[in-house]
């Protein structure tokens, strides 16, 4: 399947009490309606294309690579060295790698069409005794302060490169950063860089990839190529809403299909029109509920709460049989064990604990010289991992106030001075007696969130606790 984040195509949801899930805070402006329609068209055109996309290949070497300054030797935190391009710092505006088709041009390579692309990168670390992390970003390498990080690639010590697949849209530009660098990056004209660095020698881009044709989505929407307008509408409506349309509503969508059919449009084009209309309709945008919830509506509410997605077959079967209405605890436990529950954990802790703001600024590297970029990234994940652990083990939420353990990975354990942890995964680590690291307010991420880039801020910290913990 194709994984793609559509939130960037829609206006942000209105926030009430720190969360964007309150129904009473929902607004539907003309701008939002147009955004839904535009997004619906974007989705339909890519789910039901008229022809199989052509898969192409592009090869890039050091001659095609550019950095924070074109031919940045002596000018920035990156430079070309024979057959390699070298990154030394973690701040993208001082050290990043992007690439162009023409070696003599600085026009950055642009993704030509929506789809899945495979990146095969030859790269290795230099003067490093441990694994490193490469960041893949969207954005113009000449304006890296606007980068959007879309994936981080851990590279084990001794690794010679990596292969990954990304879902990209037309117009996207790619750039690489050295996210685990020890320094933010600086001019190399006066003082050469002697620490760990990442060397890139070759990259191959292949895409858009099409595993099979027609695709799984096309077969699901159009199981046959001679569907009648009524069949087509019923099929798409069932896939989107999991419930039948009323006769009056169904009639309107059938008319759209018939109009397309009469105009001589292909079956794919007709299906696109119906899909766009349904995606932008209240039947899909709103979750309609009865004054007294039915079991099926309860299943939808539970699923969107714990999975941020529509219910699966097992949950709908439990609702249809009446089992969900009698006792939902079994289904709740099953759903929390499903990987999709990670969406709820991510979303809830991001908004409640403001994890996405931990790295908004700082720390000032002139003051905190030993804090590395990936350590700060780990700080932002600690609150999420503590919540996940308490939820999975059914532990008391009092651990957020005080605890005799912390959730840490290798970098955070090293930063806290705790026993060594192997790898990037977070595990519970027992705290020594009289340690003050237990609980949310002692987490490095929380302390950074409620500080400036160079000093603590007790007033800001106290205000945050009152608003988010005791409100």
Summary of predicted features, one role per range:
Residues 1-471:
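Low-complexity, glycine/serine/threonine/alanine-rich intrinsically disordered linker
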